[in-house]
Regions:
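Hydrophobic core
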Residues: 23-27
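GH16 jelly-roll
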Residues: 12, 16-19, 29-280
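Short, Lys/Arg-enriched N-terminal segments with co-localized hydrophobic residues
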Residues: 1-8
């Protein structure tokens, strides 16, 4: 009788072990499936993915991105010194982090980073999108934008500029989309303010343009809020029929956001989940 009790106990233990192993394997498989599902790039009907960066590498991909370096205001009276140091730009937990810091560096009192795809990955027509979490604070100026590939040999604004997203820290519920070109630049640029009823910096949002030969449309979380047609420029030249390169940066101070606030918290981070370019 005692023998049978021992056998039954051993069988129960074996069954319990099998159940536990099954649960462990199942959880591991589900986790792997969930990760793969999260990492999958959604298919956009009618579009083909041309190039992208999911920022899932250990370092910033030098085959996609290079850096603008230095200070001098960048034509806007900005206060930062742009570097390529990991303190200012790095990959962290599957995201690009652009970090603005309050520190004395090369004669400036602030540092940040400005990444670009110039001469590496350029775009002529298509959908250009990024999922970004912007920082908030007086004087912060995160942006996702593009310049014409002939920028180095052509005066601005003749090269053309497409501002997919600019966020001004002093107005946390607001983003701006703008088109700059010859005769319509700076304060005369073709632009649209897009105001929300919440702080945009609280969460990630998707910013995009869809660019065609005669029209550019702006999107915020897949909702169109602005468009410019070639015919809207009247006698001014449409310069958006050539390749452009992508720029991601976090500026400090300058003409648009105004002075940096005394209570603006540093370091301040701009997080970029991905950049994707689709074409038809």
């Amino acid at each position: 009788m005692q023998y049978f009790k021992v056998v039954i106990m051993k069988k129960n233990q074996i069954i319990l072990v099998i159940i536990m192993l099954t649960l462990i394997v199942g959880i591991a498989a589900y986790s792997l499936w969930s990760f793969s599902k999260k990492a999958a790039i959604p298919v956009r009907e009618g579009w083909t993915l041309s190039w992208h960066d999911e920022f899932d590498t250990k370092k910033i991909d030098s085959e996609i991105w290079t850096f603008d370096l230095g200070a001098g205001g960048w034509g806007n009276g900005e206060a930062e010194y742009y570097t390529n140091r990991p303190e200012n730009a790095r990959i962290e937990k599957g995201m690009l982090v652009i970090e603005a810091r309050q520190e004395k560096y090369e004669g400036s009192y602030y540092t940040s980073a400005r990444l670009k795809t110039q001469d590496l990955q350029e775009v002529l027509y298509g959908r250009v999108e990024a999922r970004i979490k912007v920082p908030s604070g007086l004087g912060l100026w995160p942006a996702f934008w593009m310049l014409g590939s002939d920028f180095d040999g052509t005066n601005w604004p003749d090269c053309g500029e497409i501002d997919i997203m600019e966020h001004i820290g002093k107005e946390p519920d607001l983003i701006l989309g703008t088109l700059h070109g010859p005769g319509y630049s700076g304060a005369l640029g073709k632009s649209q303010w897009n105001r929300q009823n919440y702080n945009i910096a609280d969460e990630f949002h998707t910013y995009a343009i869809e660019w065609e030969a005669d029209q550019i449309r702006w999107y915020y979380d897949d909702i169109e809020y602005f468009k410019v047609n070639r015919t809207d420029l009247n006698d001014n030249k449409w310069v958006f029929d050539k390749p452009f390169f992508v720029i991601l940066n976090l500026a400090l101070g300058g003409t648009l956001p105004g002075p940096i606030g005394l209570d603006t918290e540093f370091p301040a981070q701009m997080y970029v989940d991905y950049v994707r370019v689709y074409q038809k």
